[in-house]
Every structure is written in structure tokens, then in C-alpha cells.
Amino acid sequence: MRSLVLAVLAVVPSTLVLSMPAAADCAAITKALTGIVTDLTCLESTDLTTRNDATTPPDNSRPGLPPNAFTPRTDAQAVSPDAPFRTAIDPSRTFPGLQITGAMADDANARWLLRLPAAANWNHKLVVGVPGGFRSEFMGDFIFSDLVVQQGFAYVSTNKGMLNFFFTAAGADPLACRLSPRVAATGAAFTHFYANDAGNSIREWFRRTLEATDVAELAIDAHYDRAPERVYLMGISNGGHVVRRLLAEAPTRFDGGLDWEGVFWSTGGPNILIDLPVALRNWDGYVTSGLSATSPASLAIRAAGYPPDIRATPPTPANTFSPLVGSLWETHANNYWDVTTCVFVRLVDPLYPVDQLDPLAASDTKDYDYLARRKPFHLSPRVGQVATDGDIARRLITVQGTMDTLLPIVHHGRAFRDAVVTAGRASLHRYYEVQNGNHIERYRQTCCNFVQLELIQPHAHRAFQLLLDWVERGVSPPASQCIPRGGAIVSDPAAAARPERCASLLVE
């Protein structure tokens, strides 16, 4: 009966099927994971890439959760370029295998996803994808999974132990965080991020990533009857931070990693709780100035490390929290600056009395002063537990764009590179700056039309291939370099007169 059903499924368009349980294989995997995971689903897929619509579940498809808590398709699209610049999928092949999902036994919201290629296609290696923000385990479906599944890797990802967010009422929810600055059209909207719930922490991200790796290795052994020969990490933003930490504190588990625009944390700075409040304190003044580049507010934001503001061509009225997308700073302020500050203040400094309802309370996100609170409120030990000191013990390639307007490159990518050099680990690290690259790929395209921006994904994917050659063939990757607009990583940056760091954050 199983073979008959599969024969029928073979002629059904892949957009319709994630298929059916593969009884024998799934039974072995279920047995191997007994007592470790819960809510396990194991299905045979005709194609593990996103060409199969069933690969990434619909948004809000987990019963019992509020809207926005679980949004796999939104998560995958948020960090990926739009077509036609998405990861290319070979039209001449399909990529069958098992798709397995579940949660850790101690927390039903600590979710993971595992994709196991058909045995004939598996290359005996595993990639661990770590999402950015607080997004789901499906966030890397376009940017990570589609790349590595086609190469025969098994792929596992985790939501780092927590769901995303839901909209809430500020007065009734003590953990509410305003979505956008007060002057924005969405300044009255409030969110509740699961990261701020009791028991959740940044440290949990590291533990849950290691647990997802454990799950994958157990399932791989049960399915293929052998352990993976190599295990690699790939992470973006908060996920890049996790990659950096794990290559320092758990290096025996991994062979190397790709860090795409990871967050830098240091007890004495820089860190996002120093940068973001400065931008927020000056935001109203910048708006009042008519978004003038020469206003004192603009100069103060630039002095905090942020790249220059740019304008969309043409402005777009949709697909954003901004009523009109005309300014890159405005788009980041309304989507990220305010809410990110609030969430991380609650994570790192829970004694800070966040008050976003009373303009006179002087305890809003823009009022936060990390350096003034660091010693009195003992923040150094808390930040030290998640800091990225550069003491990596496995090969790592970092890629970041110079126009990153959420994590300014001068305080994140460059600061981490400096930390690696100071730690004496430069031989294990390569650092590639993408001229005009931004934190959000889609902002270059029809979402927002910031045509001055460059995509980072092609360089991140190239960096992963360089990492594989470095680890498996001993081929040293090209030296750290600035990748110019329209360019690529070159083997001899000195001969090409390329510095390690781009001379300007913006090249028009």
C-alpha cells in the first residue's frame, strides 16, 4: 500500500505534498528520540526545498497560539531576497527525503526542524541553521536550507527555545513593548515577545542550538546508521551571535561556521543597548528637521555609528509598518529600533522600569543608559555570559554589509573582527564586508526600493563554499576584504587594491 501511495504522490505537483509517514525510517527515528523530544512528526517529502509549498508551513498554523507567534513563511521571506534573487533551485532535479519536526521534551515551545535527504543523496554532513531575531525554525528555509539540501547536507534548525510575539494592550500587559517610536503611525501598537517571558534568556539560545544538534545526530544515526562526518553552523543576526559563541564555548561539536551579520556583545561596549537608545533619543528631532542630513539629530545618529540615511526610489506605500517608505532610517526605526531596544532591555536589565505610556516618565527606550546602569545594576556579569570575545576555536567566516542600519558595522562586524585579532585567533577567521549591504535583503527590492543597497546573500553563500574548502581540503580562503558594489570575493585582495574594510559606508 505504501509503494502504491508513493507512486500516486509522484504524479501530484510537489506544491501539494509533504507526503506521508515513512513508517520504518520514522519508527527508528522516533525510538532514538524517545524521552528527548515531544510532538514529533516525521513525513516523507517528495522535495525538501521550498519549491515544494509544503516544505514551509503556513503562518499561524500551530493551533492554540495567537497570531504572529508562529509565522514560518513570513520568517523565511523576511530575511531572503525576493525572486529572482532567491537561492536558485535546480529545475532538473528533486530533493526527496524526510522532514521531521518536534519540540524538546521540557518545553513544547522549544521547536526544531530536521531535513534528512534520501540516503543516496546524503553527503554524510550536517548543517545547523540558527535563525535571526526571535523567528521560527523555518526562518532559514530560503537562505540556508535551499542551499545546503541541494548539496546533500542534512539540515537542522531551531527557534532557539522560544516563539516570536503577539500584539497586546500596553496597560494590561507588563511585558508590552511598543512597536515603533511614539511619533510613528504605529507608535500606539504594542507587542509581547515570548523572549521576555519568565525563564527565557539569551543563554538559552546556545543550549537549544546544541540540543537541536543532538537531536539531528541521533536521528541521523538511526536513519543512516552512521554519524555525520562534519557538522557546520550557519547563523544570521542573533543566529550569527550564536555561531560565534558556540565556536568558542563548544568547539568540539562543530567543524566551522558562517556568521552572517551577527550581533556583537561586550560588557563595556559596543553593544546594541548603547547604540539603539542614541538613535531613538534623536529620532524625533530628525523627523522634525524634515529628515535633514545636516540636522544635529542626524549628526548624532551618525556619530553613534549608523550609516547615512538614504531615500527609496520611488517611495512605496505598502509592505512595511511605515506609512510611506521614503527613508531607510525611518523603516528601521518603525520596524526595529524601538521594539528591539525594549525587548533586549527586558532581557539584559530586567530591573529597568520600562514605561512607554507616560512621556514624562523618563524611563522609555530612548532614556535607557546602559553604561550608567552597568555597575550599579551588575549588568557586566549578565552581558558577560553572552559576550562575543573573539576567542573562537574553529574556522569562522563573517559577512556583513556596510549599510546595516540595525547593527552598525563599526560596532558589530568590525568590533568582532577586532576581538578575534586581539584574542590571537585571526588565523581561524575571515571577514568580508559587503559595500552597501543592509541587514534586511528585501529592502533593496519592491518591498522598499532602496536601490542603493546590495544583496549579501550571494557573498554569504560563496563564503560557505570557501568554508567547506578550508575545513575539508585545507584551502585557505581569500584574505579579509571589502567587496565593492557589483563585485565578488577575490582570491588576492591586495592585488585588487581592496582594503579589509570599506573606506565609506555608502557608495552611491
Please report, for each region that a protein language model flagged, where it lies by residue.
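C-terminal His-loop and adjacent cap/lid subdomain of alpha/beta-hydrolase
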Residues: 24-508
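Bacterial N-terminal signal peptides
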Residues: 6-17
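Sec/Tat signal peptide C-region and signal peptidase I cleavage site
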Residues: 18-24
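Positively charged n-region of N-terminal signal peptides that target proteins for export
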Residues: 1-4
